[in-house]
A protein has these predicted regions:
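Interdomain "pre-motor" coupling segment immediately N-terminal to P-loop NTPase/helicase cores
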Residues: 1-4
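SF2 helicase/translocase NTPase motor core
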Residues: 7-25, 31, 38, 52-54, ...
Length: 196
């Protein structure tokens, strides 16, 4: 453990979290990601090899360097709790989870329409924020209002880092695919981007 900490101490400002003993490939990913000033990086390890840990290490390093403070994680619904608990337990990073059912409640309780702008670190499920084309019983105006409130408010919240877990799910054969639109909008929403 001390050898790993000594090897990483030379080039990194963040210290390793007490519960983290990074594997060599995770240190390699951290090194590669931090080689450039414009981090737009794909973490494409196999399932179970610790992409969330790699992302957490990159978050810690970017925060230590003062490069990010507002972070958005968008992931499949089934991974929201895992992301929140791993960031808290392993990196001591508290993220606000915003589920679809929370949106109106937060807006009412805070009397603030900028739901996502109220929190510096947010985790939200991908399918709950993707743009919709139509909805049964809704007029075009209501669909547009929904998209503006949910999707465009998250896109325009001034994120420093956007992390998309399940990025392979945004691929589509046409630019009209809702997840593709979401991925494209999120990729433009911040200077730093991690795709998992």
């Amino acid at each position: 453990l001390s050898k790993i900490k000594n090897e990483t101490a030379g080039g990194f400002l963040s210290s390793l979290a007490s519960g983290i003993i990074p594997l060599p490939h995770q240190l390699h990913v951290l090194n590669r990601a931090m080689e450039t000033n414009n981090i737009r990086y794909i973490l494409a390890d196999e399932v179970g090899l610790g992409k969330t840990i790699e992302a957490g290490m990159i978050i810690r390093e970017l925060k230590s360097r003062g490069l990010v403070s507002r972070i958005l994680v968008v992931c499949p619904t089934g991974l929201v709790t895992q992301w929140a608990s791993e960031m808290q337990e392993k990196f001591h990073e508290k993220f606000q989870v915003i589920l679809p059912s929370d949106y109106d409640t937060i807006r009412r309780l805070t009397d603030n329409d900028d739901v996502y702008g109220q929190f510096d670190q947010v985790i939200s499920p991908m399918d709950s924020i993707k743009p919709i084309e139509k909805h049964a019983g809704w007029s075009e105006e209501k669909v547009e209002k929904y998209n503006e409130e949910r999707i465009y408010s998250i896109i325009n919240s001034g994120w420093d880092l956007v992390i998309m877990d399940g990025a392979h799910r945004v691929a589509g054969s046409a630019g009209e695919v809702a997840r593709y639109k979401l991925g494209n909008l999120l990729a433009q929403a911040s200077p730093y981007l991690l795709l998992l």
